[in-house]
A protein has these predicted regions:
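Short active-site loop/helix that positions an aromatic residue
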Residues: 564-566, 577-592
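Duplex nucleic acid-engaging cores and interfaces of nucleic-acid transaction enzymes
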Residues: 574
Length: 787
């Protein structure tokens, strides 16, 4: 499921750096253009007139402009001048043409990027792929969808709009010849005709699955996944009967019909997006990407499992059925990776696993890695304001609040006062400074180093005031299903297996040698009191977990509703585990998961009309950020309406699914409050949590988040920097080498002056280039576009 929007590309890089010996992902550039760039001169003039006109004439001019745009015939064009900037001589003649870096974005390599004929090693500009913003010009989008687009006289065709792009009104174009040469790879042998002959597909899902080729990924050297040693098996589902808070929806009327706590039979897709591999295949758990293939795979020795005499009274059998019902012997076929049907998104459109493998080989495809699990936890993690705002305000007394902030305050104090901490911060991400500080510790009093320290403190302080608090012995990790239970179902045929992890327990090897008994399980987005208090496995169960689960993934039970409470899949979703006593003690009592029946995605034939409807409808119904902020404003008010936030949480999740379902419930009686809260100013702590202006925020309230914001400021705002001592200044003369006397009138000195002059000229050229790169980075949005 979709989580909070994060910079996935930066995480992508960090996680590959952490796994030793792997090739790093390469960065590339592409153009990101807009439908406005396709305007004719007449359309542009009408648009300018529309923007400048008064309110009375505005509707008339809008209709004239829109009618003119809709009547365009032929293929729209974006000429070369939209892609480049120009310098002219005094006579108006072009003397220099340069790429317009303001129109470019930076991405990391992906499956599609590797299909291009470009060298990806040099931060290349890739012209085979272009991103476009619809900018609410839906008529132009339809024209491009039906007819393509000419960019610098090259024809481009619509490729897809990923889930993220659909919400933002964007889509992907590819150069026509590039598409024709690679369409079998993009679709791994499928065509729209094949899909339609087999009943069609939900348009939103179809677009998202096509977009998998654009997900950031690498094929790691030395870790090729052999498709012939892989197998696709059915999904493993169980049903759990537990108490839930039901939000009833009348799907025909699209209305909320009631709410109440009761016991329900809840279906749990235990392996939703997850598979497993023998521990020798990859160095750690990983998210995978390939055409139509997406999810996470986790290490588990299923051969060792098969070697047991019996499990729950049954001898494991290596002969199993794949997703199509065909028989396989896992041992004889040397199977090393087992995928589940939920990972191969279009599996029903292939006739068999052999059919998929045939297309895979014919198109010379590879299973790539999107991200490896973190194998070196830092030993601490930071909270989100969402985790804090849902704690009980009555339980979070001033004393408890001080306890919660203590580690963060200590860290901020160390930045200001402790020399070793200062040096560590000053040298972080800069090896040259680190080496210099090792030789001359006094460098910490240099003005440049001090400016870095002051900036670092302000950033960390602002983060803390935005409720990003340090939690010791806490970590983010992948969520892993109980693979022992899965193997018991798969190889022993037991429908509701016991597994290893008991009801209301979790396991993570990070806590094997730590004294904690209980953790809070948290995940973003965290909107309605989604605190999953769980016990850590101990004693005999712990020893069995050590035997079967070796990585730092959090293994969850197959017997409880943690997945419903936190709304996670196991396709690479991450969880925060914290044993923080204050948080656990301040969690509200008697939490039960919210439960509702969502709208079902509807299949249709794949055609341009269906694609147009899916993209435009999603663009016009995106309000996820608004819903989250409305809920935060509700928590920030003294009279928090918890029923309203339950409804908003459900509404938010239905909105997340909108690209697939194309359906949403009406707010009804909750709409008035929704609009009122939407119009309210932001809470004070949003100045630091989201960079909002003071003028757009309220005064400090008594909410959890605002109280922490105020407390952090009072505890750290008045302390002086320990390194801002007028008597402690860095003397650069200690860097001088006095062994060799210098004669400024000597011939050698004049030669050195000439060398220095040449170097200064080179420095100016380099500085200019660096400014261009910085300018590009500042204007570039590094977006994962991971479906």
């Amino acid at each position: 499921m979709n989580g909070e929007v994060v910079n996935e590309h930066l995480l992508f890089v960090e996680n590959f750096v952490e796994v030793e010996g792997l090739n790093k992902p390469r960065r590339i550039r592409i153009y990101k253009l807009s439908t406005f760039d396709t305007f004719t001169e007449e359309e542009r003039a009408l648009n300018e007139a529309y923007k400048k006109t008064g309110i009375k004439e505005r509707a008339t001019l809008k209709k004239i402009r829109d009618d003119k745009i809709a009547s365009y015939e032929g293929i729209r064009k974006i000429d070369r001048k939209k892609l480049y900037t120009y310098e002219y001589d005094k006579d108006g003649k072009v003397i220099k043409e340069s790429e317009d870096i303001n129109r470019q974005i930076t991405l990391f390599e992906s499956e599609m990027m590797r299909y291009t004929e470009n060298n990806l090693d040099g931060f290349s500009l890739i012209m085979d792929i272009v991103y476009m913003k619809i900018a609410y010009q839906t008529s132009i989008f339809k024209q491009i969808l039906d007819r393509g687009l000419l960019i610098d006289d090259e024809q481009y065709v619509f490729f897809t709009s990923t889930t993220h792009q659909m919400k933002n009104g964007e889509f992907v174009l590819v150069q026509k010849d590039f598409y024709n040469d690679n369409q079998n790879k993009f679709m791994c042998g499928l065509t729209d005709d094949i899909i339609n002959q087999k009943g069609g597909c939900n348009s939103g899902k179809y677009l998202a699955y096509k977009g998998l080729t654009l997900s950031s990924s690498i094929v790691p050297d030395g870790y090729e996944i052999d498709i012939d040693k892989c197998l696709l098996v059915p999904d493993f589902n169980t049903t759990t009967n537990e108490k839930v808070e039901c939000i009833d929806i009348d799907h025909e009327k699209r209305e909320f019909a009631g709410m109440g706590i009761r016991k329900e039979d809840v279906k749990i897709p235990q392996m939703d997006g997850a598979g497993m591999f023998l521990p020798s295949v990859l160095p750690a758990s990983a998210q995978i990407r390939c055409s139509h293939l997406k999810g996470a795979i986790f290490p588990f020795d299923f051969r060792k499992f098969l070697g047991q005499d019996e499990v729950e009274g049954v001898r494991p059998n290596p002969i199993i059925k794949d997703a199509w019902g065909n028989i396989h012997d896992v041992i004889k076929e040397d199977i090393q990776v087992i995928f589940t049907a939920s990972q191969l998104k279009m599996w029903k459109y292939y006739n068999s696993w052999d059919d998929y493998k045939k297309a895979f080989h014919e198109n010379r495809m590879h299973i790539a890695i999107n991200k490896f699990a973190d194998t070196e936890p830092k030993g601490y993690a930071k909270t989100s304001y969402q985790f804090i705002q849902t704690l009980s305000s009555e339980k979070l007394t001033d004393e408890k609040l001080a306890e919660l902030c203590a580690d963060t305050i200590e860290y901020l104090d160390r930045i200001k006062t402790d020399l070793d901490t200062m040096i560590k911060i000053a040298s972080k991400d800069d090896d040259y400074i680190s080496l210099a500080l090792e030789v001359h510790k006094e460098l910490v009093y240099d003005e440049y180093i001090q400016s870095k320290l002051e900036s670092k403190f302000k950033r960390e302080s602002n983060d803390a005031r935005g409720n990003k608090l340090i939690l010791k012995d806490s970590l983010y990790s992948y969520i892993c299903p109980d693979l022992y239970a899965f193997c018991t179902w798969l190889f022993c045929g037991i429908e509701n297996p016991q597994g290893i992890i008991p009801h209301n327990y979790v396991y993570n090897s990070f806590y094997n040698d730590k004294p904690y008994e209980v953790v809070d399980c948290l995940r973003s987005p965290h909107l309605y009191v989604e605190h999953g208090i769980r016990k850590l496995v101990k004693n005999d169960v712990l020893e069995k977990c050590k035997e079967w689960f070796n990585d730092l993934d959090t293994v969850v039970s197959s017997h409880d509703l943690l997945c419903r409470l936190l709304m996670f899949d196991v396709d690479g979703d991450e969880i925060l585990l914290t044993p923080n006593k204050t948080i656990i003690e301040c969690v509200p009592d008697d939490i039960v998961p919210l439960y509702y029946v969502p709208f079902e995605p509807v299949k249709s034939d794949i055609n341009n009309d269906a694609i147009y409807q899916a993209v435009v409808s999603c663009m016009e119904n995106t309000q996820i950020g608004d819903i989250s902020n409305v809920m935060t404003k509700n928590y920030n008010n003294a009279d928090t309406d918890m029923e309203f936030n339950k409804i908003m949480c459900c509404y938010n999740n239905l909105s997340i699914d909108y690209p697939k379902t194309q359906d949403i419930v009406k707010l009804g009686k909750y709409e008035e409050k929704y609009n009122a809260l939407k119009g309210e100013n932001n809470p004070q702590f949003f100045i630091y949590a989201k960079g909002k202006s003071k003028g757009s925020c309220k005064a400090l309230s008594k909410s959890n988040a605002d109280r922490i914001c105020d407390y952090i400021h009072k505890q750290t705002g008045n302390k002086k920097y320990g390194w801002q001592d007028s008597e402690k200044k860095f003397n650069p003369s200690i860097l001088f080498n006095n062994e060799n006397p210098v004669t400024i009138n000597s011939e050698k000195y004049h030669e050195l002056e000439k060398v220095m002059f040449t170097l200064r000229m080179k420095e100016q050229v380099l500085a200019s280039t660096i400014k261009d790169v910085i300018k590009l980075k500042l204007r570039t949005r590094i977006s994962a576009y991971a479906p």
